[in-house]
Structures are given as C-alpha cells and as structure tokens.
Amino acid sequence: MAGKRKRANAPDQTERRSSVRVQKVRQKALDEKARLVQERVKLLSDRKSEICVDDTELHEKEEENVDGSPKRRSPPKLTAMQKGKQKLSVSLNGKDVNLEPHLKVTKCLRLFNKQYLLCVQAKLSRPDLKGVTEMIKAKAILYPRKIIGDLPGIDVGHRFFSRAEMCAVGFHNHWLNGIDYMSMEYEKEYSNYKLPLAVSIVMSGQYEDDLDNADTVTYTGQGGHNLTGNKRQIKDQLLERGNLALKHCCEYNVPVRVTRGHNCKSSYTKRVYTYDGLYKVEKFWAQKGVSGFTVYKYRLKRLEGQPELTTDQVNFVAGRIPTSTSEIEGLVCEDISGGLEFKGIPATNRVDDSPVSPTSGFTYIKSLIIEPNVIIPKSSTGCNCRGSCTDSKKCACAKLNGGNFPYVDLNDGRLIESRDVVFECGPHCGCGPKCVNRTSQKRLRFNLEVFRSAKKGWAVRSWEYIPAGSPVCEYIGVVRRTADVDTISDNEYIFEIDCQQTMQGLGGRQRRLRDVAVPMNNGVSQSSEDENAPEFCIDAGSTGNFARFINHSCEPNLFVQCVLSSHQDIRLARVVLFAADNISPMQELTYDYGYALDSVHGPDGKVKQLACYCGALNCRKRLY
C-alpha cells in the first residue's frame, strides 16, 4: 500500500470571540456576501430561470431607513431543494469544459444523484424523474442533443442504475420507451437521412417476442403491449415513431446503441443496465406474435472490434460471490475483524508466492482509542426529538446543519452531498439509534473483502452494490497529537484531522462552501502561527480497522467527510468515508489521499516522491 499521511476535508469558517475590529471586518464580509447572493438570485430571475427562488421574495419593495437610504436586506431564505437547484446552476457555469469525457460523465451522474436525493427528501413522487426534470431546467444534461454511435466517456460495459440516470447523461432520453430516436427537428443536421432515426435501444425483457443471443438479437418493436399488467401484447404495432426509426437505421446502415437491463437484488433500484455496444440493424419484418397481434421484428448484429460483452458478468455477479469462506480462492483470513464487525471481512491473497495475511502485526479495533494527553470535549446538549428526527425546524442538530438534515432516509441512510462538516445526533439527543441523523454511527452494512493487489499492496472491495451517499466506514485508529507522531518513521497510516485547516482553505486545501453553523466555543484559534499543521491525527499503524487498507486514487469513488456527533470540536472530528458514486460489485474502493505534489520531505529536508499506481485515466503519476 502506498505510503501516506492522509488528509481529511472539512468545515466552514469557524466563529470565535474576537476584537471589535475583527468583528467589523467579518460583518463587512458577511454583508458583501449577502449582496452578492442577492445579485445572483436577481440575475437568475431576470433570465427567467426555473431554478430561482419565488418572485415574491425577489420583488418586494425595498425598505428605507429614517434618512431615506435603502435598508440592507438579508438574502431570502431558501429551502434545501432551492439551495440544491442554485448550486446545480452555479456548478454548470462552463468551468468543466476541459474535463476528460469520462470525468464529465461522472460529474453529471453525481449531480443527478444529488438532485434525486433532494427530491426524495422533499417527498416528491417519482424523485428520479423529478431529478431529471431539474437537470433539464438547469441545462445540466451532459448530451442534450441526440448522437449517433458511442457517447464520449461512456464505454462498453458502463453500468447505469436506473433509466433516469441514462436520461440525465443524455444516453437514452426516454425513461419508459425502449427506442430513443431523432425526430424531425434534426432534419437540417441529417438531411441525407430519412427521419425519425434510432440512436439507442434498451432491452428490459418487457416483450414476449424478444430473442436475445448476445451478439445477435431479434428485437421486438415498441407499442401494443400491456404496460401495467402481464406485459403481453394486446394490440397490433404500427410502423411509426421508434419502429419507423429502426427501419430507417436498417435502410441507411446506421448503428444503434444497445443497453440490456436486468433485475438485481443488491442494486438500490433492484435493476442494473449495462451498455453492450453498437449493433447494426440487419433486417426488419412484420409478423404475428405469440399473442396473435402484429409485431415488428428487427435482427440486430453486434459490430466487430468492440470490447467483450459484460452483461453476463453483471447479471450473474451473485454467482461469483462465494456462499461460505471455504469457497474463496486465496483465502488467508476468514475475518480480519475477529468477529467485531457485524459482517465478517475476509482477506484473500492470490499475488504472493507465500501468501501472508493483512493481520500480521496488526490489531483490529472497532472504535477509536484516545491517547491520555488528548482531551475529548464534553458531550454537547443535543436535540429534544423523540424516536427519530423528522422536523428540521425544531431539531437542534438540523439547525447546526444549516436548517436541514444532511441525510435522506433511503437505503438505511444516504448523505445528499458532501459538506464541510456533518452534525449528527449524539449521546445526549432524545432520538433513538435508528434516527437517520445517526447514519454514520450504524453498523457495517456491506459485504467487503480485503485483497492483495499486484502493485498497491492490500486493497478493499465490496461484494455488493453501494449506493452513492452511503457511509462505508470510519477511519479508526489511535487519536494522538500530531507533534507526538512526527518522530515515528515509516508510519504509512497517519490520517491528519485537518478539518479546521480545510475549512479555511489553508495549505492549498480546497474548502467546501456549505451552510453550517460551527459553534463559537470550539476552542480553535485561527491566528496560530502553525495554523497549517493539524493538532490531532489518527494513527492506524498497528491498531485500526479495515479503512487503513483502502488505497488512493486520482479518480476515487469514495470521499472523506468530517462528522461531529458526541461533541462539537472540529479539531477532533470523526473521519468517515462515503460513496461518491454508485459503486458496482468487485470494484476497488478508493479515495483521494489529498497530497499536494512536493509536499512530503524526508529527515534530510529533501522532497520525497512516490509513484502512483491507481490506474485512473487521469492519474497524475505521483502520489506526492
């Protein structure tokens, strides 16, 4: 495993007692921020944006002071849904034009996941479709215009977890219809073709006359089947819309994208859709179907020279997961946690000639150990909710989170988006252990495996799907003062708790601009001469949990989230890893260690360098 001094990301500007001069400077900055917010909201309104706040808040007559000058108004309060819409608009202002195509796809899907979870939190019907609608309004669809052939950034084997995800990217723009096609609005661009012209089909097994032999497919056209009942054909199909579009593809030798959908119990939507590449429409005809009605048939042939099909791997992924540890190839440890975790974590090693176990010289623990010279603050008062926190207007913990809950009660709790800091309910709160605002405190929910990799040492992967926003684990070890571990050489498992530094953007760290209320009495000094150095760290060198085996990636699928639950001192925040994307089974779990290049120095003061073997398309080739 690559050597690392891990870095956490964390919260917003901390308030503290300060001089009158400093208070005036801060108030001036807050006033300027309020003015900019008002201007931005008004700009969105002037452009008739669908995602701005209500007009009644924007066009109220400005109040005046006694001297006739206009009073400074606070920016209008926004709901969580409105904030999400504003940030969606701001995040799509053209700054990402230079991103690689696959990174654009990843970012687009993350935006959709956020909108989807916001709609779930707002208890809207069909939150997946509402999420797509919000992206359409914000002009956030990655490929809004239909494209023939492969879409940049979406390779053969790419997995979607819902039809709405495909719509959000612009891969297949019909959430229900199996055939996506260009209508007559494209006639100027495709004047040499007859329209409509098909660009994509999704095979979901809804038609009784379909015949799928992988490379060769007999596809049944659209229309005439019972959508709500047994899916059987109930009337004749017509040669129109998608059916006519496939006919034109056959006549003009235009390939179509083929995506197969399958039931999958471990997927959070119970479905998974795999892109299987481009197919040529070789032939079409009309015939009487199984139910006696006329259906249109299309023979599709997969184009040569494409990567191998992966749908079967997805469809039968459960078959690759052993039912007992005795079936695991290369097993070196049945459970590295020794029964401490709710789900056992096996370890496998098929790399070394003499396989070794990751537990050698390592003690597994489930909770943090605190060094004697580290003083943990007293527990905060907490909220007065009962059972589960549901009313964000009354819950004290929700108020700390900016007036809304950071989690949505879906799939046992999912974080809507990354924040500077998340305030969870703690030991003195009135709610119970099932409260959604205790999501990261719950037991291990996924079947994981520690495995030996060829270049990166030990690594971690999941045997099942992990939905975006799900907590995977907390980084566990011994909490020490950073100054006490600086003399320990070759310790690769030090995680600096630099939430305070990140929230102030110190040392090149990137802030997360979130609406949180960091308490004034956290005891943190912002004027320290050594403010770039975190005061505390987590040492998992010889004692810790499986999080120590999670590797770095320049394009990670996890992110670091600082969480406060038992107290409100961000210097000692809990470090929790959450899923940034919907993660497929057997995919390695990774996060960004956060090193800046040339930031690590040896005992001689010289810059140390370490190669990165993450394998990402945009790997920067060096860890530090």
Curated annotation (Swiss-Prot):
Region (Disordered): 1-25, 54-86
Annotated tissue distribution: Expressed in leaves stems and flowers.
Compartments, as annotated in UniProt: Nucleus; Chromosome; Chromosome, Centromere
Catalytic activity of the protein: N(6)-methyl-L-lysyl(9)-[histone H3] + S-adenosyl-L-methionine = N(6),N(6)-dimethyl-L-lysyl(9)-[histone H3] + S-adenosyl-L-homocysteine + H(+); L-lysyl(9)-[histone H3] + S-adenosyl-L-methionine = N(6)-methyl-L-lysyl(9)-[histone H3] + S-adenosyl-L-homocysteine + H(+)
Residues in SET domain copies: 446-594
Binding site for Zn(2+) 1: 383, 385, 389, 395
A cellular component term, taken from the record's GO annotations: chromosome, centromeric region
Residues the entry annotates as binding Zn(2+) 2: 383, 397, 425, 429
Residues engaged in binding Zn(2+) 4: 554, 612, 614, 619
GO process annotations (BP): peptidyl-lysine methylation
UniProt domain Post-SET: residue ranges: 608-624
Residues annotated for S-adenosyl-L-methionine binding in this entry: 456-458, 493, 548, 551-552
Binding-site list for Zn(2+) 3: 389, 425, 431, 435
Main location: nucleus
Keywords for the protein's UniProt record, in alphabetical order: Centromere, Chromatin regulator, Chromosome, Metal-binding, Methyltransferase, Nucleus, S-adenosyl-L-methionine, Transferase, Zinc
InterPro entries found in the cross-reference section: H3-K9-MeTrfase_plant (IPR025794), H3K9_HMTase_SUVAR3-9 (IPR051357), Post-SET_dom (IPR003616), Pre-SET_dom (IPR007728), PUA-like_sf (IPR015947), SET_dom (IPR001214), SET_dom_sf (IPR046341), SRA-YDG_sf (IPR036987)
Domain of life: Eukaryota
Chain ranges of the Pre-SET domain: 381-443
GO molecular-function terms, A-Z: double-stranded methylated DNA binding; histone H3K9 methyltransferase activity; histone H3K9me2 methyltransferase activity; methyl-CpG binding; methyl-CpNpG binding; methyl-CpNpN binding; zinc ion binding
Enzyme type, top EC level: transferase
E.C. number(s) listed in UniProt: 2.1.1.-, 2.1.1.367
Family listed: Belongs to the class V-like SAM-binding methyltransferase superfamily. Histone-lysine methyltransferase family. Suvar3-9 subfamily.
Note: Mutations in the KYP/SUVH4 gene decrease the level of histone H3-K9 dimethylated, trimethylated or dimethylated in association with H3-K14Ac by factors of 4,3 and 3, respectively. The level of monomethylated H3-K9 is unchanged. Such mutations lead to a drastic decrease of cytosine methylation at CpNpG sites, causing the reactivation of endogenous retrotransposons. The KRYPTONYTE methyltransferase name was given according to its involvement in SUPERMAN gene silencing.
Description of its domains: Although the SET domain contains the active site of enzymatic activity, both pre-SET and post-SET domains are required for methyltransferase activity. In the pre-SET domain, Cys residues bind 3 zinc ions that are arranged in a triangular cluster; some of these Cys residues contribute to the binding of two zinc ions within the cluster.
Subunit structure and binding partners: Interacts with H3 histone.
The protein, known as: Histone-lysine N-methyltransferase, H3 lysine-9 specific SUVH4
Species assigned in the record: Arabidopsis thaliana
Gene (name only): SUVH4
